C-alpha cells in the first residue's frame, strides 16, 4: 500500500494530473493500493500513518471518520478531541486517485465486526466516484446497527470550485 501525503498533483496542474496517472498505473501494475495524493493518511487502533497534529488517543469505542480533505479531517480532530470525542479510525483520501470515500466505507462494511468496530461513521465528502456503491454500503452498515452522518461539500457553484481547487475533486453527483 502507498500513501502519498504531498500535494501538487491533479488539484494544481495538468502536469500534476499526468503524474497522478503515471503513479496510479504503476500502483495498479503491482496490485498495490493507493491513498492520496494530497491527504493526511490514515490511522486506526493498530496502524498510524498520519503525519499531522493532533493525533488523538484511539479507542475501539470511538467513531470512524472518512474525509476527502486532510485539512477538514484535522479541523474535525482538533474540534472533537477538545470536546472529548474519541476516534476509532481516521481516513483521509485526498485526491482519491484510487481509493475514495466509498471504497473505505465498503471496506468498513465488508469487515464489520459488531463486537470490535465502531457503530458511528462520520463522512466528509468532496466527490463520489460511485454514488450507488456508497449508498449500498451505507445502507448495509445502517442495517448492521451503525449510524452515519455525512456532509457532501461542493454542491453549490462556489463550493464546487473550492473542492476542485482543494483536492482536484470534479463536481460529482449529489444523488447519494
Language model feature labels by segment:
Residues 1-176:
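Catalytic-core regions of core metabolic enzymes
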Amino acid at each position: 500500500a502507498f500513501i502519498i501525503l504531498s500535494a501538487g498533483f491533479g488539484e494544481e496542474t495538468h502536469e500534476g494530473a499526468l503524474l497522478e496517472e503515471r503513479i496510479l498505473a504503476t500502483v495498479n501494475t503491482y496490485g498495490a493500493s493507493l491513498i492520496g495524493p494530497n491527504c493526511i493518511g490514515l490511522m486506526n487502533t493498530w496502524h498510524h500513518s498520519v503525519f499531522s497534529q493532533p493525533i488523538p488517543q484511539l479507542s475501539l469505542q470511538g467513531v470512524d471518520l472518512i474525509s476527502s480533505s486532510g485539512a477538514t479531517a484535522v479541523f474535525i480532530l482538533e474540534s472533537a478531541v477538545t470536546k472529548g470525542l474519541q476516534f476509532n479510525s481516521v481516513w483521509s483520501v485526498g485526491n482519491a486517485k484510487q481509493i475514495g470515500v466509498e471504497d473505505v466505507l465498503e471496506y468498513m462494511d465488508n469487515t464489520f465486526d459488531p463486537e470490535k468496530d465502531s457503530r458511528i461513521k462520520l463522512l466528509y465528502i468532496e466527490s463520489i466516484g460511485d454514488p450507488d456503491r456508497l449508498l449500498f454500503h451505507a445502507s448495509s452498515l445502517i442495517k448492521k446497527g451503525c449510524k452515519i452522518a455525512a456532509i457532501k461539500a461542493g454542491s453549490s457553484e462556489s463550493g464546487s470550485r473550492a473542492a476542485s481547487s482543494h483536492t482536484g475533486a470534479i463536481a460529482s453527483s449529489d444523488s447519494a
